[in-house]
Amino acid sequence: STGDSAALPALFGVPFSVKDLLNTRDMCTSYGSRSFQHYQPDKDVVAVSRLRAAGAILIGKTTTPEFAAKVLTDSELTGITRNPWDTQRSPGGSSGGACVAAATGVGPLAVSTDGGGSARIPAAACGILGLKVTMGAIPHESWPFHYGNNSSISINCRHIEDLVASFNAMSGAHTLDPWSRRATTKLSLAPSPQGSPNRKKILFIPALGGQPCDQKILTLVQQTVTDLQRAGYQVDQANSDPLASDPGIAMQLMAANLAARV
């Protein structure tokens, strides 16, 4: 015991995991592929280095499909990663391992990546938080950068306080990532609202990307909207789908980046 907690780093002693797509100096980085199962990088990515500097302790790497190329988490190297709530179902992907680790309490923080939903999709499937940060907010310099500037370092946690603290530790400009040169954003938690929550507004988008959704999910989401309204929140429904033009174009561009680098 130091006797002076204020003198300790912000994340002193906090265990964290890292998606096996990001380089770590003391653990192999396979990118989910048997071709790289023994690859040992000689240094951490910037985000991991900053977490260590903040006192956090890396406890392991989490599973990803090969080269993070799909929204399920399985590979010949690590087998099938299963949903912690129902092992007959998938946790989603490609950061399925990160979200399972966070959801099951392996650690309060899981560092992941997100290009087209890789941190957000499994977060939804596992019932935790998933944040894809603005490009450059957290430096992302490591190979395989196969999704171009669509991909970013992301965060998966159970609690918003952990998400804020980890973002602040990893964020900021770094010379290895030119997109981060103007990154100055730090997060803070707003004080708990006093009195009625009706000052809070929520945007509800019933359809996103023109994709079909299971009726059971739609029913549950609509019930959530109703519950929020009864609690006093203002819920505004979007009249248009911001991704309706053609999300397939974005996926084609990401696939082209992948094919050019693998």
Regions found by a protein language model. Name each.
Residues 13, 19, 51, 79, ...:
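Conserved hydrophobic/aromatic pocket- or pore-lining residues that grip, position, or stack substrates
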Residues 8-11, 52, 102, 196-197:
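Extracellular/periplasmic catalytic domains that process cell-envelope and extracellular macromolecules
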Residues 20-22, 115-117, 162, 206-210, ...:
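Glycine-rich beta-alpha junction loops
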Residues 1-6, 169-262:
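Amidase signature
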Residues 27-31, 60-61, 147-148, 203-206:
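Short beta-strands and strand-loop turn motifs
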